[in-house]
Amino acid sequence: MFRTNRLPKLFIAGLLLLAACGSESHNMSDMSTASTGTDAAGSESSFNDADVMFAQMMIPHHEQAIELADMALDPTLKASEQVKTLAAQIKSAQDPEIDLMTQWLTDWDQPLMDMSEEHDMSMDGMLSVDEIAALGELTGAEFDQAWATAMIAHHKGAIKMAETVKDDGQSTLVQDLANLIMQEQQSEIAVLEKLLD
């Protein structure tokens, strides 16, 4: 039985509040300022290209994790209760993170990634359309094993992306989210690995 930690939800709510407050005063008209990651006030909302890329790439990465979680919750695939509980936990964690990153891109006057572009599938841990279709053909224990294996790779990809923005990014809000993603997903990987034992 997995227990969903309420702390990440409170943390995300706090970040959303900070983002909303920052968006009221932050002027994004000077894109040369944004590209250097500084603004006139040197405020919390300062960001650079690495922060933008992190949000643009992590949103579809999270969206695919939620798609995989929805598959596990589909009763026709007969996933185990352990898998279904973890899938629900993943959805609960990543849905608000998508909202947060989308709000950042809006505040920064930056676009979402074009999901029609083929390169989005090259992100670390992302499954191809064919791989997702193949997963959907499995049921029961076979589905559990394949799902856990896919989700471990997917989580490791997200952790790698978080590590990159921690090295290259500037926004302290992005840094905080990257730390949270690493913490959440490392914990979930440990659970997923036990499912493979």
Residue ranges and their predicted role:
Residues 17-20:
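C-terminal motif of bacterial Sec signal peptides marking the signal peptidase cleavage site
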Residues 1-11:
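Bacterial N-terminal signal peptides that target proteins for export
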Residues 23-197:
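All-alpha RGS (Regulator of G-protein Signaling) helical domain and cognate RGS-like helical scaffolds
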